[in-house]
Amino acid sequence: MKLRPLHDRVVIRRSEEESKTAGGIVLPGSAAEKPNRGEVVAVGTGRILDNGEVRALAVKVGDKVVFGPYSGSNTVKVDGEDLLVMAENEILAVIEG
C-alpha cells in the first residue's frame, strides 16, 4: 500500500536511533526517547494560500529532517511499518550533507 498525503502534509519514516548511551548503557525500549529525525517518504501537493494559489513544499522525498518531540502525532501503519504524517510546518530543519 502506498500513502499519498494531501495538501501540506508530509509522510516521514522515523530514523532508527542507538539504544545505547554515550557511556555504553543499553536502554530498554520503554526508556529510550523516540528519535526526532527521519526521512521524507512522500509529500503532498502543497499549501493552499488565502488567494487560492498552491505553494509547493520546501521538503522533497529523500530529505533527512528534524522535527519536534511532539510533532507527527498521527502515526499510520503501512506494510508493517509505522510512518508519521505531519504538516510541513512541524518540520524544524532539513539535514544537509
Swiss-Prot record:
Protein name per Swiss-Prot or TrEMBL: Co-chaperonin GroES
Function according to Swiss-Prot or TrEMBL: Together with the chaperonin GroEL, plays an essential role in assisting protein folding. The GroEL-GroES system forms a nano-cage that allows encapsulation of the non-native substrate proteins and provides a physical environment optimized to promote and accelerate protein folding. GroES binds to the apical surface of the GroEL ring, thereby capping the opening of the GroEL channel.
This protein's record includes keyword Cell inner membrane: no
Naturally occurring in which organism (per UniProt): Pseudomonas entomophila (strain L48)
Assembly notes: Heptamer of 7 subunits arranged in a ring. Interacts with the chaperonin GroEL.
Family: Belongs to the GroES chaperonin family.
Keyword vocabulary terms for this entry: Chaperone, Cytoplasm
Gene that produces this protein: groES
Gene Ontology biological process: chaperone cofactor-dependent protein refolding
Record-level GO cellular component terms: cytoplasm
Lineage: Bacteria, Pseudomonadati, Pseudomonadota, Gammaproteobacteria, Pseudomonadales
Keyword Translocase among record annotations: no
Main location: cytoplasm
Any one GO MF annotation of this record: metal ion binding
Places the protein is found: Cytoplasm
